[in-house]
């Protein structure tokens, strides 16, 4: 499978509309949500420390923004741009320059902005996987995707909000554990539904 075929598979651009399945997407996201939130619940002290350091962690910011750059280059290189296809090469040049400029001149809360960008990018494959699927339970995926979109926009434009949210959530261990259990529960429900109903 070449990169164009991979793009077509992820975003259901094949002539028969085949691609990334609802079941596979649900299983992967369910596992990620369940395991990550269970880790946060079982290791509250360590995970709270990680969460508090994250907003101003420059290393994480560069790593996540690098992932966003590669993802954006992939999209720009293989997406159907219609009548704007002549701008493709300029876009491919602008993206790395923007990456460098953001790292150099927007260091404040870089990790939060990068995470917000990643959330915006990640929402699209999830929405494509659930599009036109008959199961009502498919809505578990679009709900998650739209939460990512809304929160991602706030993280990019108002990154200090993540610091405030983390401060609130980590004020007590009980509050952190409750939030972790809620995330784990959503992941487990999504995983079970994906295995049984998708």
List each language-model region with its residue ranges.
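Hydrophobic alpha-helical transmembrane segments and adjacent interfacial helices
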Residues: 66-78, 98-105, 122-133, 184-191
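Short juxtamembrane and helix-loop transition motifs at transmembrane-helix boundaries
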Residues: 46-55, 71-84, 99-110, 164-168
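N-terminal topogenic module of multi-pass integral membrane proteins
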Residues: 1-70
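Membrane-embedded alpha-helical transmembrane segments of multi-pass integral membrane proteins
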Residues: 29-32, 36-39, 67, 95-99, ...
């Amino acid at each position: 499978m070449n990169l164009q075929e991979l793009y077509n598979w992820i975003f259901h651009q094949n002539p028969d509309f085949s691609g990334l399945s609802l079941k596979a997407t649900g299983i992967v996201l369910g596992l990620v949500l369940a395991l990550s939130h269970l880790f946060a619940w079982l290791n509250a002290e360590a995970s709270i420390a990680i969460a508090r350091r994250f907003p101003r962690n420059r290393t994480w910011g560069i790593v996540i923004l690098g992932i966003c750059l590669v993802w954006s280059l992939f999209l720009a290189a293989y997406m159907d741009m219609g009548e704007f296809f002549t701008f493709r090469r300029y876009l491919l040049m602008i993206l790395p320059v923007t990456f460098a400029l953001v790292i150099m001149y927007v260091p404040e809360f870089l990790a939060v902005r990068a995470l917000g960008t990643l959330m915006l990018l990640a929402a699209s494959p999830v929405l494509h996987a659930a599009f036109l699927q008959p199961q009502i339970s498919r809505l578990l995926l679009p709900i998650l995707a739209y939460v990512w979109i809304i929160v991602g926009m706030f993280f990019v434009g108002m990154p200090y909000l993540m610091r405030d949210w983390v401060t609130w959530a980590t004020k007590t261990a009980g509050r952190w554990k409750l939030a972790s259990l809620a995330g784990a529960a959503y992941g487990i429900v999504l995983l079970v539904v994906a295995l049984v109903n998708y």
